[in-house]
């Protein structure tokens, strides 16, 4: 039986490449902010959604918080209420730092 996967961030870099690589092997339910789907019959939740880059130089704290914190809490809460057994969350480099001053290591204290 094909595993069913609920995925957020399917239009981002990681999500797009993940789907292209695994689309023949799994069944996907794609979460979009417009449809606001809920986890129902999926076995696995992959939470790839997040805002990491401000390419337009229009930094908006509220938007970063909504996407990176509120959405994560909502998705995880829905996961806990679902039959899914696995939750995988990929975070961004923004959770550690927001500049290129030094190389990233495990010893760096997060400073988002």
Report residues per predicted region.
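Short alpha-helical oligomerization interface
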Residues: 55-71, 104-112
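Phosphate-coordination loops involved in phosphoryl transfer and adenosine-cofactor binding
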Residues: 2, 42, 84
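Glycine/Thr-rich phosphate-binding loops of Rossmann-like dinucleotide-binding domains
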Residues: 15, 55-56, 97-100
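Adenosine-cofactor binding site in Rossmann-like domains, unifying the SAM/SAH pocket
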Residues: 23-40, 53
């Amino acid at each position: 039986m094909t595993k069913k996967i609920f995925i957020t961030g399917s239009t981002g870099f990681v999500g797009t490449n993940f789907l292209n690589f695994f689309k023949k092997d799994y069944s996907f339910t794609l979460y979009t902010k417009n449809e606001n789907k809920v986890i129902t019959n999926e076995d696995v939740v992959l939470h790839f959604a997040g805002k990491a880059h401000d390419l337009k130089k229009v930094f908006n704290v509220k938007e970063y918080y909504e996407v990176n914190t509120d959405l994560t809490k909502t998705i995880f809460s829905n996961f806990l209420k679902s039959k899914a057994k696995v939750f995988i969350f990929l975070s961004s480099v923004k959770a550690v730092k927001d500049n290129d001053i030094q190389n990233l290591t495990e010893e760096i204290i997060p400073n988002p």
